[in-house]
Amino acid sequence: MTGEGYFEVAHVERNGNRVPFFVSVIKNQEQVEKVEVLGTHFNINAYTNESRIETTLINGSIKLASKYNHNVLLKPGEMSKLGNGKIEVKQADTEMAIAWKNGAFVFREDLPSVMRKIARWYDVEIVYQQTAPENLMLGGWISRSSNISEVLNHIQLTGKVHFKLEGRRVIVSR
């Protein structure tokens, strides 16, 4: 898979043996992570324009295997981040990980990360002017049913960034 997906997988047995369910994560036309599902609810964020693949376990258990020979067993409430050939496991904000599925944008990240999410959701191109803030961190919640102007206006309330919408392009400046 490429992109983002939420999975609810039931434990299945056939002839007394557990039947595995696998999700393969593809990046640059190459399998970089394989998730073996052991009866669970989990989310995978694996967009090609993101530097990391994030897998968040809501409940149950999953086993991750990367092309870099890393194997990890996640426990409920944990997330793995695969990037630069390493898997990092940490406690997850599960609400934030599946907010998209529940119709919300939840941000606790830098401006470029937020803008990549907006670009995907609204199918727009993001253009940064030289005056765009470089290290602006954003936090907040807004409904995904909001139109793009509402979302951009909420972010502009920080007073540290300005947006201009020109057709399918969002111009970002200070």
Functional labels for PLM-detected ranges:
Residues 1-174:
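A residue-level detector for the "anchor" residue at the start of short, highly conserved motifs
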